[in-house]
Amino acid sequence: ADNLSICDYKDFISAHKNRPANTEITMMTFTTDDPKSCGVIKIDNSGIIQEFHEKVQNPPSTIANGAVYIVEASVISYMERLKKVKVDFSVDVLPYYMGRIFTYYNGLYHRDIGNIRSYELAQIETNFLYRKTS
């Protein structure tokens, strides 16, 4: 994926370990300033994904898929059973597990850097973050 993420990975792992029953994937999420360019999600009160919208014209939220996941072994087994040379996680896996994907919100820093403008912005923002914490 073309994302830059700064987060507390121990907290992310802890969230996965303590996720609701019957969930097999924990997805990192973030607030995007450009929801039309991202896969955005809608979650229930437990933080479980109920809807996923990939780069739609009228996104229903600004909470986006960070494309960073922790998965159970059962998810890997499912992917192997697909018998594909290339598995597209957004197309082949996420829809199958809809309603069984827990979310972890990264409030520290996450930016899609898939174009020059966002890449340059990430350089400025992360330089600012590091100066602020030094």
Q: Where are the predicted features?
A:
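Short beta-strand segments
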Residues: 1, 27-29, 105
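Catalytic-core segments of class I nucleotidyltransferases/pyrophosphorylases
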Residues: 4, 13-17, 33-35, 48-133
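Charge-lined substrate channels and their catalytic hotspots, especially those that engage the 3′ end
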Residues: 8
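Short, structurally constrained coil/turn elements
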Residues: 19-21, 43, 97
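A short, conserved acidic/glycine-rich loop-to-beta-strand motif
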Residues: 20-31
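Short acidic-glycine loop/turn motifs at beta-strand connectors
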Residues: 42-48
